[in-house]
């Protein structure tokens, strides 16, 4: 396959990353080539709408970006995947497809339809290896927003802005386009918070994190949620791990619902959340069995086990997350099984998940609200795949729009990443964030 390294180098220098949540640099996925490119528009988290907005309103950029990915990697097939209920998006994309090697595949409305392991098998029939990546089987999966911005980078634009969904207790819920580094406070001032108690989340209700007004938009930020307190406690209880361990030891009913509904388990991957949480809760001095640790590494952290499946409100997902942070992945071979006969019957419909989370009232139409251009941005230096970024500017420096202001050293083989200024400005501060004021 012919790989266009010049295009891939432009993608690298632009700092484009996976915008579906992973944040893995796009160039690193593209540089080894592929046979199939999947533009993932499943947008499976409840209430999110920004990917649908992009597909409805920028279909030519998506198809051009998909073609760019194909020619850059040598791929012979391009596929746009999106849910069959996204009627407007499907119509917009179909009108732009002129080539026989590009197709649309429509997905059923379940969570998590966008999981790469599940998506790749559904679309291609190929199975991602245990603990592996789609690139190992000749498939690259990019979020549709990544594909959109790839087309802009090829036109010479820097990757400095992104789209986000703003949902919940706000007067103007919908899609916003903002510079990377925009403070949540500035966004919510535009969206107009209602005068009610709320708690903030970012990125997703199932896989996202707690947030506050001082947070700033990162490359991977996909959404801001302002939820009522009573709802937010269901979505993300943020329980300390020692309490989770004690609760599991005393309250686990051994019902196996967490495993029975686990999408990765149903897909045949070696993970059994009920065994992991039991083994961890009964371990002494964190002497956890290696097989338990190895299984935890197959968790996608989708959250079904703790938010939907467990009748005792235990937290297998948080246990898996903790194990992956606290323990090195062991050299234990776990085989892959056939997909469960119950895979289709146990898919979790989004409508049922929304009802369980008590968030029906916050569903909103796919609509663009505004482009926000604040006078100041705060660009984080942490949280990037590869390494902590090192600033390339100092206090009082003037910077131009698109200028690389921080990057990491990729000469040692590390994954390269950078961040660019979203406008002409002056550096006010260089600490854990680079603060830029517009001039």
Residue ranges and their predicted role:
Residues 227-249, 259, 264-341, 374, ...:
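Ferredoxin-type iron-sulfur electron-transfer modules in oxidoreductases and energy-metabolism complexes
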Residues 207, 241-244, 412-431:
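Short, compositionally biased
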Residues 126-129, 143, 333-370, 434-437:
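Extended boundary segments
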Residues 365-387, 407-421:
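Short beta-strand-turn/beta-hairpin segments enriched in glycine/proline and small hydrophobics
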Residues 37, 56-73:
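Histidine-anchored nucleotide/phosphate-binding helix
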Residues 76-186, 190-195, 204-205, 228:
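Hydrophobic alpha-helical positions that pack around
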Residues 389-398, 402:
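Short histidine-centered loop motifs in beta-beta connectors
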Residues 38-51, 170:
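Gly-rich Lys/Arg/Thr-decorated short loops/hinges at beta-loop-alpha junctions or inter-strand turns
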